[in-house]
Amino acid sequence: YMLLGSFLSPLRNKRTDEYGGSLLNRARLLFEVLDAIKETCGREFPIILRMSGSERDPQGNTVEDMKRLIPYLEQHGVDCFEISGGTQYERCNKIIPCHGEEEFTNLKEAREIKAVATKPVITVGKILDAKLAEDVLEAEEVDGVVIGRALLADPDFVEKAKEGRYEEIAPCAACGVGCVGEQTKRRPASCVINPLAGRELEFEEQPAKEAKKIL
């Protein structure tokens, strides 16, 4: 989203040399970085590229632009695509979708990119429902999902889902208050759902002395 994303985006890249203008020119620096990684680390070194499936701006890159770019990125050594959305500037709420955004925010673009890619495609963006995530994977809509904030809310999210204990998962509110909000203030991440998040070494989790039925 920062340097390489700015070069790739027509919203930010106003250069008139070989690094600006057309889609492939805007991607030139990214291609060079990918080539340098493979040259330095070896062809077997895996590269996962996180990219916006769509910048969601009338003047920005669209999913069609990204689909055109996929074969070139594979030629330059990308082994897996992680599909996000938006930009660091105009559509930051799409990068970290909050409670007003739909779940699986970038799934539509990820599906379209998977249709043209020969490498695995994974998606990220407000993936909060474990059962829905399993359904998406079982339907092979994408090859993988990336879960972030939901693991702050409940570090046992994956284990509970694996055991079918969906109702026991503490649900992420997608509020962005403790995780994103605290980081913007240069403070350690926390979570309004999980008071132990970011403080695991300060407090030891203890079982309740007496069980209570809340609802």
Mark where each language-model region is.
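Flavin-dependent oxidoreductase catalytic cores
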Residues: 1-215
